[in-house]
Amino acid sequence: MKPLVKKMLTVVLCASTLTAPLFLTGCSVSKVANSVQQGVQKKSQDDVKVFNNYIKAVGDFNSHTVRFGYAIGPDIQKLREGQHLTSFMAPHFDSLQKNLQAAKDAGVPYDDMKEPLDKVLAVLKDIVPVASELDTYYETNSYQADNYAKEQQLGPKYVQLYDQFYAAYNQLDAVIHKHNTENQQAHLKELKESGKKNAAAAQEVHLRLTALLDGFEEGKQIDVNAANQELQGIMDVSNSITSPEYNSTKNSLNTAIGRIRTFLGDQTNDHYNDMVESYNRFIGSMNRLDMNKLDK
């Protein structure tokens, strides 16, 4: 379950959206996170806005992919195994290509983003037309006319490009995740130094919950006792927030924690997906929260 994507915005506070790009081989996890106000680490507002372009691009892509993972996952698996399809769904490669290219045209905020970004765009240039052709092929039932001839031609090519895409995409994620984490941690420090106890606690809750889920890596045994202890610690911090403005977010947090504990007790794909969805709802609540009101 390696984190796939992080997101940083310039408003309200740092928050994340957890999504899963695939439900085929383990528990890939991605996140979309928000950071606040004036771009920590002394970055200008323009730099933050440029970074946000990438955040929105990958956030939209991941949201669609997890929403329709029930179809995307089985389709790529069947093509990988040489099975015939009668319908087809791919991630929104075309939208991602358009949005990432627009983001690149506006600027690249970190030097170490340039190479992985170019790799992703290069694969997208190849996979977008193949995915589009397959989509039309199945939508028009052309497989009935050619007895799956085009599927046999394009299916293996699509699978190969699909794997190349995620190999490149995960590299881009790692860089975005690194910078976003640094910015969020710096912002937490700012909140603490400015005496905004409730806002700092809300930010700490988000960061600790995100770090916990980051640790649920595919193929790595989870220390369930340690995870439950950390969840209790997160709840303790949440309970220290005295502002009623946090109540709705706290309810979403408690639900997410419950789903995480269910997953820890029985680590199935269904429980994992429930955990991801409840985490998304918690972050949705965080993104609607006005952090400035927490310490008034």
Question: Could you tell me what each predicted segment is?
Answer:
Residues 2-12:
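Bacterial N-terminal signal peptides that target proteins for export
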Residues 12-21:
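Bacterial N-terminal signal peptides
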Residues 22-26:
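C-terminal motif of bacterial Sec signal peptides marking the signal peptidase cleavage site
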Residues 30-85, 148-159, 163, 174, ...:
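Immediate post-signal-peptide N-terminus of mature secreted/exported proteins
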Residues 41-148:
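N-terminal Sec/ER secretory leader and immediately downstream segment
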Residues 132-159, 264, 268-276:
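Polar/charged, Q/E/K-enriched amphipathic alpha-helical segments with strong coiled-coil propensity
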Residues 151-250:
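Extended amphipathic alpha-helical interaction segments
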Residues 229-296:
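A cross-kingdom marker for long, charged
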